[in-house]
């Protein structure tokens, strides 16, 4: 029998207890010292039989099971084990087999109790402080945290970008966001503007567009430029828009024309590509016409007549004078010198459907059609000129007499169509004619309806004549058999320019670049586009809309569009307004005709009264004239009756026009 006390006496380190310390867990191994106490393990110096060794191994394994509860609570400890402790005990076969029944198990039981107490205290600490335990996060939680961090970083970046952009632009005016969007869009454009060296293409109908620079008033209001001219035939309008959720964006509309001139183009460049090719036509026996069309204040008079300084004008830098100089240059060339051509000029205006001569104290003229269906302007005088300087004098004289008025866009706006004609005559016979027309500013009916009756009548007549002009040019371009030139006085006077094989026309559409004129600019471009109907990408449409959105939010709105019902109601009111204007114009003409008849056939009562003032007047003569006057008076009763009916109808038409105008103004105020 081996006594355990003897073994302990020989190897005291086998039963020596050490303090516990937590450490990383290791896999359980047999023949290792118990995990809850730190003790040195050495090989026993007392040999024993194999049964005793197996009994000890079993006993040690039993004690090692105390570690399991501690592992479940994530508190792991490890006792350092010497290298020798992992080796098996040496077994001496010469000794008898020891018995394990007499070995006392008190130290092992004490070790087991301490391990259980330690495990119990660990469980209590974990349950009392659940936050101290380290828990692994799931993959979903980690991904959500990553997304949150990315969103915060993106917001911070956007905030920095907004602050930087706000520093680059002046926030004192409300349209700086649109200015930034337009600037960013222009950076992406490939610009190839028109140059003087570009070839000149000849067209029977040439439609061009010219953009003027921002004027002093627009710069003072801090307006932005919404027009871009990326190429020699393409023009873009950056129309500001506002969504329902107050998101601002641009609708970029493209228009294609034969030539597009930006704000840097001079009058000389515009003339080179527009009116200059037409000068050759009149020397070949043809008729040529050049129009300047556009909104009030868009630069029509500057282009046609020259530089303006208040009401004075430098006519030498306008298309009128440039065309005159080229006419005299061609006239003196050898190929045309033998024709013995003489140059004449006329200058008249059409105001409110009436024709007035600008070179003869604004004498009123009549437009009639003779038996050969040729339109004649009765009383219009032609002035012979021998050089370009004479022409410039005539232009200055006529421009000073032109009818003008004040509008919302121009304090000195031309309210009439001015027509300057250069005629070539050979032995009194008309050889060619070049008509240069400075059209009145186009107005919306809704804008003119709020003014007085005179201004409303001006606007109605201007729009009527411009519509007739557009249809006449389209008929010329499409070679239609019928040309609606009788629709207005303007097309009547220019009738011979729309018929015949050798007729050419050029239209210069003038536009304003400011954001406040965007709607009027689009109306001008659509008018010019329908004259010829070119597509920006060789398609059937003349417009292409490309939207560029930005996430800028603002409560200010550029403008609200009308609903379908409101547009229909306003359209019906405008139709009534235009019908009333047409009736007024027709009745006015009838009243003038009746009055002329009465004046021509009626007696001169003033002459009879003056006759009686003479001391030696002939009484017989007086009686004869009085009887004749009374007879004529009876015959003219029907003319008086007709005039009375016309005046009543004219009064009714004026009342209808006034009522329609008030309805339109009321509708505009409610909007």
Curated annotation (Swiss-Prot):
Motif stretch (Microtubule tip localization signal): 44-47
Region annotated Negative regulator of microtubule-binding, chain positions: 153-184
List of residues binding ATP: 210, 294-301
Record keywords, A-Z: ATP-binding, Cell cycle, Cell division, Centromere, Chromosome, Chromosome partition, Coiled coil, Cytoplasm, Cytoskeleton, Kinetochore, Microtubule, Mitosis, Nucleotide-binding, Nucleus, Phosphoprotein, Ubl conjugation
Chain coiled-coil ranges: 566-601
GO molecular function: ATP binding; ATP hydrolysis activity; microtubule binding; microtubule motor activity; microtubule plus-end binding
Ranges annotated as biased composition (Polar residues): 121-132
CDD domains: KISc_KIF2_like (cd01367)
Reported modifications of this chain: Phosphorylation by AURKB, regulates association with centromeres and kinetochores and the microtubule depolymerization activity.
Keyword Nucleus assigned: yes
Gene Ontology biological process terms from the UniProt entry: attachment of mitotic spindle microtubules to kinetochore; cell division; establishment or maintenance of microtubule cytoskeleton polarity; metaphase chromosome alignment; microtubule depolymerization; microtubule-based movement; mitotic metaphase chromosome alignment; postsynaptic cytoskeleton organization
Superkingdom, taxonomy of origin: Eukaryota
Region Disordered: start-end pairs: 37-58, 115-138, 533-568
Any GO CC annotation of this UniProt entry: chromosome, centromeric region
Expression sites by tissue: Testis. Localized to the meiotically active cells of the seminiferous epithelia in the testis.
Span list, region Globular: 1-200
Residues annotated with Phosphoserine modification: 41, 55, 57, 61, 112, 121, 133, 138, 465, 576
Boundaries of every Kinesin motor domain copy: 204-534
Family: Belongs to the TRAFAC class myosin-kinesin ATPase superfamily. Kinesin family. MCAK/KIF2 subfamily.
Function summary: In complex with KIF18B, constitutes the major microtubule plus-end depolymerizing activity in mitotic cells. Regulates the turnover of microtubules at the kinetochore and functions in chromosome segregation during mitosis. Plays a role in chromosome congression and is required for the lateral to end-on conversion of the chromosome-microtubule attachment.
UniProt comment concerning the protein's domains: The microtubule tip localization signal (MtLS) motif; mediates interaction with MAPRE1 and targeting to the growing microtubule plus ends.
Protein name listed in UniProt: Kinesin-like protein KIF2C
